[in-house]
Amino acid sequence: AKNKAMTQWEYLPPLLSGNCVNDQTERPQIYFQDGKYYLFTISHRETYADGLQGPEGVYGFVGDGLRSDYKPLNQNTGIALGNPINLNFNPGKPYSPDFNQSPYTFQSYSHYVMPGGLVESFIDSIGGNKDGNPVRGGSLAPTVKLNISGDTTSVDRTYGTNGLGGFADIPSDRARSNGGDTRPQRLK
């Protein structure tokens, strides 16, 4: 806003854009840690420009201020947390060889990076039934935790069970912890 009454506005340039690379970066989140600004956003494989591809997942960037030159995390890949292209087929196979099969089995999306590095996601399909068809999940995915340091992130494998916490493990009523505790917590 250009005034305190918030009746005049000015458009500012985007914090990050993927022109000619990716036409969709969504759910941007700013995370502050150790004097750095971390910008996380999500994207999808099918939103990359022709001839380019990347995994569905969380992409992260680090800068010295809100309006700084953000640099991609993890050796300039930007990938902070990604899904395999398709868990149903071996690498190198077509993306979706059978249009009746969900290419998203066991895959999560719509990630949200929270303070402390916890990541909530949504999951569509959670494996297959006895016929091998995906079972609809339609729910929050298991929580994971990212370790964030400098220009690097990694999945915290000590969180939960080998890096996977409980479904919707959001410790909003307790101090930040290592997490992964799926027992009910009493509100204080």
Language-model-derived ranges and their functions:
Residues 1-188:
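Carbohydrate-active catalytic/glycan-binding domains of CAZyme proteins
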